[in-house]
């Protein structure tokens, strides 16, 4: 008998055994791949609350009442934070200075505000950082009374601002500088409050114009007032609605920070896919039932300005700090010390964003 040739039926039996083994191995591999495929979405969203996990209470302040915060309003109203193990309380603050103070003291754990309004204050030494930027761009317009139809008509008039140094003040100052108005040509009058109060000051002719964001532009037109300038044409670096937190949260509770950022990322998707629910949340906060105005706000803040990756553009932070320095701010912190992109970057690295959007993330990187 030649070497290697099986004797009798033993070789055939062994061959059948090896064949069965290969089938079992193949089946096990198939089951393994299937299990991985099923588990992948769970792994891609590691931030969801787990069974039996106690929700963590957090306070999220806002610095104004505006259509630009539609994503936060929708997240709170539709319990998105609860999915991530958070019991979020929305706290209304008035103005960036008050809001930053509440965050720095620990009264609030998070702040949702236009970063351009907060960066100058943060740069003076406040131990606060930006951790996500859902909206990037400048949505403001200048509205004026009926007799003011052009920028030239502003001479001898007054424009409302919240308070000296605040965002409306700096935007109005940049606008007047752009068109060579001197300090005696157009006055900036602090009226406090938020955009609705500034609008009412214009209605009462205490001032003759103010910078606002949608949906107040629709109301202004309905009331016979004019929209005479879109501030996006100033070509200023501008980071709008952003998530802020303090050093204590970053050091002691980074997991909670990550969950808040994840919830806000989902809110971008939710608002885009559920316009009626988003507008209902906005209507509740703004106490507004004008469907045209609500649609105006929805269009303004859910399309061109949306930054689905939530990363903070470093160049815009640096330019905003430089503008603040030129305007007399005592800058004590470097631009890179004012933001932390790791939480937003984790969403993409983990596969969370790809799963959320069902593939490639829409839109360009900002």
Question: Where do the language-model regions lie?
Answer:
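Pocket-lining segment of extracytoplasmic ligand-binding domains
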Residues: 116-117, 188, 196-287
């Amino acid at each position: 008998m030649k070497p290697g040739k099986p004797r009798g039926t033993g070789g055939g039996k062994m061959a059948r055994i090896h064949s069965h083994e290969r089938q079992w191995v193949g089946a096990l591999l198939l089951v393994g791949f299937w299990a991985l495929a099923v588990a992948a979405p769970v792994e891609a969203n590691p931030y969801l609350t787990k069974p039996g996990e106690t929700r963590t209470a957090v306070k999220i302040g806002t610095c104004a009442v505006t259509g630009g915060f539609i994503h936060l309003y929708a997240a709170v109203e539709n319990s998105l934070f609860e999915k991530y193990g958070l019991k979020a309380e929305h706290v209304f603050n008035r103005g960036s200075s008050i809001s930053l103070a509440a965050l720095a003291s620990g009264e609030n754990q998070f702040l949702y505000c236009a970063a351009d309004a907060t960066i100058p204050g943060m740069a003076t030494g406040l131990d606060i950082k930006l951790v996500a930027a859902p909206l990037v761009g400048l949505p403001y317009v200048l509205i004026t009374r009926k007799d003011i139809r052009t920028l030239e008509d502003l001479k001898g008039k007054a424009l409302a601002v919240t308070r000296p140094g605040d965002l409306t003040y700096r935007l109005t100052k940049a606008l007047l500088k752009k068109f060579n108005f001197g300090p005696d040509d157009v006055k900036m009058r602090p009226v406090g409050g938020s955009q609705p109060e500034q609008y009412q000051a214009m209605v009462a002719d205490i001032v003759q114009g103010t910078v606002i964001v949608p949906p107040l532009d629709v109301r202004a037109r309905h009331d016979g007032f004019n929209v005479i300038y879109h501030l996006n044409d100033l070509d200023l670096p501008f980071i709008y609605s952003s998530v802020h937190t303090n050093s204590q949260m970053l050091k002691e509770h980074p997991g909670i920070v990550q969950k808040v950022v994840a919830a806000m990322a989902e809110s971008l998707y939710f608002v885009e896919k559920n316009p009626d629910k988003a507008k209902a949340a906005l209507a509740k906060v703004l106490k507004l039932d004008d469907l045209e105005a609500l649609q105006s706000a929805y269009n303004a803040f859910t399309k061109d300005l949306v930054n689905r990756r939530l990363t903070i553009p470093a160049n815009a932070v640096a330019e905003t700090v430089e503008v603040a320095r030129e305007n007399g701010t005592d800058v004590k912190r470097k631009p890179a010390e004012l933001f932390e992109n790791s939480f937003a970057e984790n969403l993409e690295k983990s596969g969370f964003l790809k799963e959320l959007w069902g593939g490639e993330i829409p839109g360009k990187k900002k």
